[in-house]
From Swiss-Prot:
PROSITE patterns: GLYCOSYL_HYDROL_F1_2
Name this polypeptide is given: Beta-glucosidase 3
EC number of this enzyme: 3.2.1.21
One GO term of the biological process aspect: carbohydrate metabolic process
Source organism of the structure: Oryza sativa subsp. japonica
Similarity annotation: Belongs to the glycosyl hydrolase 1 family.
């Protein structure tokens, strides 16, 4: 969910000069490293009202006209009907792995109770098709698309009741698909879901309170709800991991982890205050989620700044959540510079609690720190990804790490070009960043391009394109055509030598 990254700060994109030295091939990566691409259910599947699928909070959000282009994911890329052709394209591209998410409301329309047999058949068909073609299956149980029935019943992630219902849903997935799926990500970007859905109001379910919401929300509390939602997501993750480890892992031999948006933050200056601000940004962004799952509690800097608004873990909960990661999944798109801000007095939200200011280097490009607005330009910083991966190792130990989303978008236009050389350069540079991290001892296990095909974007609808394959959304047949980036990825995966990009500050 690349556009979502923008909300975490004024979205700085680092401009990096590159020189060429040597080269790399697919074979320069460890033998157990996989290259793939990814999609998510609401953004890809479409078929919103077909075969018994229940509504999700994103259906409600988009149908209320909340998207800037007034679009919905009702059709999206029509992956529900076109998955076989897309898997064929994956094979032709040489993908070694594919990461997709399951729509909870397609599998269990009301969020609990009876399984929708048509939904079960659909996901079995996808998994079988991938397995038949030798593509490793990576499944994400939740990509921000909560069943609307549970939102209506008890406000979804704001209630501890979500833990039981989600765990029951996960049990169905492990039971039905676990014989062919060995890589499970429980939640996608809980840091994004909590902030965008419950502070700024720019993501479903669109809750916020004045003066913090970017749009006018009718319900919400931006000072409290982001922390409550994230807390329940952490407890849910832990409960699902315990279920998997106790009931399935010995037999299925799979691994379970979580996914977080993980941008790199540089201090704007070398002052002590800015150095602390850069670390505070990391603690508030991904330490918010990872620190409890590794150590059993929130970062101390968050506890101090937020106080009683931050939920606490009981002793039993601490033992439940601690050590519940077999791997870390990260979504990374760019880096940013941050500087210190004094902690504001009075009512604060997450952004004010974090107390940092973000700066960009590109003149004439405005970003607003309080929003998640999609950036208009993206200049990559592969070295930032390398530093972020190394920081995760230093902070959380030698856990395997998968880069589960990385990509660059272009604005949609009537004459979308297939010649996306800028995306090729971007991906090439970021793969180099991962390679350098592995050479420095990081236990990186995979890289997934985001998206495989153009899809509905959660912030910008159909106004931006991330895919390796172009989807013509003006054609009812939604034909796919390979972009230059798809051809480059195919050649790379066939081990053709690629120029190595060396960052020069």
């Amino acid at each position: 969910m690349a556009a979502a990254a923008a909300f975490f700060c004024a979205l700085l994109f680092i401009s990096v000069q590159h020189g060429v030295l040597g080269g790399y091939t697919r074979n320069d990566f460890p033998a157990d490293f996989v290259f793939g691409a990814a999609t998510s259910a609401y953004q890809y599947e479409g078929a919103a009202a077909e075969d018994g699928r229940g509504a999700s909070i994103w259906d409600t959000f988009t149908h209320a006209g909340k998207m800037k282009d007034k679009s919905t994911g009702d059709v999206a890329s029509d992956g529900y009907h076109k998955y076989k052709g897309d898997v064929k394209l994956m094979t032709e591209t040489g993908l070694e792995a594919y990461r997709f998410s399951i729509s909870w409301s397609r599998l269990i329309p009301s969020g609990r109770g009876a399984v929708n047999q048509q939904g079960l058949k659909y996901y079995n068909n996808i998994i079988d098709e991938l397995t038949k073609r030798g593509i490793q299956v990576h499944v994400m149980l939740y990509h921000l698309d909560l069943p609307q029935a549970l939102e209506d019943e008890y406000a979804g992630w704001l209630s501890p009741r979500i833990v039981e219902d989600f765990t029951a849903y996960a049990d169905v997935c492990f039971r039905e698909f676990g014989d062919r799926v060995s890589h499970w990500t429980i939640l996608a970007e809980p840091n994004v879901a909590a902030l965008g859905g419950y502070d700024t109001g720019e993501f479903a379910p669109g809750r916020c309170s004045d003066p913090f919401g970017v749009t006018k929300c009718t319900v919400g509390n931006s000072s409290v709800e982001p922390y409550v939602a994230a807390h329940n997501m952490i407890l849910t993750h832990a409960a699902v991991v315990r279920l998997y480890r106790e009931k399935y892992q010995t037999l299925q031999k799979g691994i379970v982890g979580i996914n977080v948006l993980s941008l790199w933050s540089y201090p704007l200056t070398d002052s002590t205050a800015d150095l602390q601000a850069a670390q505070r940004y990391k603690d508030f962004t991904y330490g918010w989620i990872l620190h409890p799952l590794v150590f059993g509690d929130y970062p101390q800097v968050m506890k101090k700044a937020i106080g009683s608004r931050l939920p606490s873990f009981s002793k039993v909960q601490t033992e439940l959540v601690k050590g519940t990661l077999d791997f870390i999944g990260v979504n990374h798109y760019f880096s940013l510079y941050v500087s210190d801000l004094p902690l504001a007095k009075g009512v604060r939200d997450f952004i004010a609690d974090r107390s940092v200011s973000c700066r960009g280097l590109l003149q004439g490009v405005r970003f607003i720190a309080q929003t998640m607005q999609a950036p208009t330009r993206s200049m990559g910083d592969p070295h930032g990804l390398q530093l972020m991966l190394q920081h995760l190792k230093e902070s959380y130990g030698d856990l395997p790490i998968y880069v589960q989303e990385n990509g660059k978008y272009r604005k949609a236009s009537s004459n979308d070009s297939l010649d996306d050389t800028d995306r090729v350069d971007y991906i090439k540079g970021y793969i180099e960043g991962v390679l350098n991290a592995t050479r420095n001892g990081v236990n990186a296990r995979g890289y997934f391009a985001w998206f495989f095909v153009d899809m509905f974007e959660l912030l910008s609808g159909y106004q931006t394109r991330y895919g390796l394959y172009r989807v013509d959304f003006d054609d009812a047949a939604l034909p796919r055509r390979a972009k230059r980036s798809a051809r480059w990825y195919r050649d790379f995966l066939k081990s053709k030598r690629q120029p190595l990009q060396i960052a020069q500050q």
